[in-house]
């Protein structure tokens, strides 16, 4: 289920990366999002919460969701 949630989160406008961490019972422990600067973190957070509830029937405390914004539209790795 982790991969399907991550793939769905990638459909959110401005999101360029996502990682979902679940415990052994399938409960979401952490969500990490990387986005560009076109939308505010608050807007992205609300979209994440809405998708989790509407598509996956999971409610997550907003404190478990972290959003890092980067300039540009991709994360560079070296």
Model-predicted segments: where are they?
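Non-catalytic alpha-helical coupling and interface elements of nucleotide-dependent molecular machines
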Residues: 14, 38-39, 49, 53-61
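N-terminal start-of-chain detector that recognizes signal peptides
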Residues: 1-6, 37-40
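Short amphipathic alpha-helices in soluble, non-transmembrane regions
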Residues: 5-8, 44-52
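A short amphipathic beta-strand at an alpha->beta junction
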Residues: 36, 56-78
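A short interface-forming secondary-structure element
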Residues: 25-47
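A sequence-level detector of short, solvent-exposed, charge-rich linear segments
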Residues: 24, 28, 47-50, 67, ...
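Short edge beta-strands and adjacent turn/loop segments
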Residues: 3, 7-32
């Amino acid at each position: 289920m982790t991969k399907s949630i991550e793939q769905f989160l990638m459909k959110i406008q401005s999101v360029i990366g996502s990682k979902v961490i679940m415990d052994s019972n399938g409960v979401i422990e952490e969500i990490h999002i990387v986005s560009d600067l076109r939308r505010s973190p608050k807007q992205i957070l609300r979209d994440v919460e809405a998708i989790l509830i509407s598509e996956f029937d999971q409610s997550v405390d907003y404190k478990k969701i972290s959003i890092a914004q980067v300039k540009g539209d991709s994360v560079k790795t070296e």
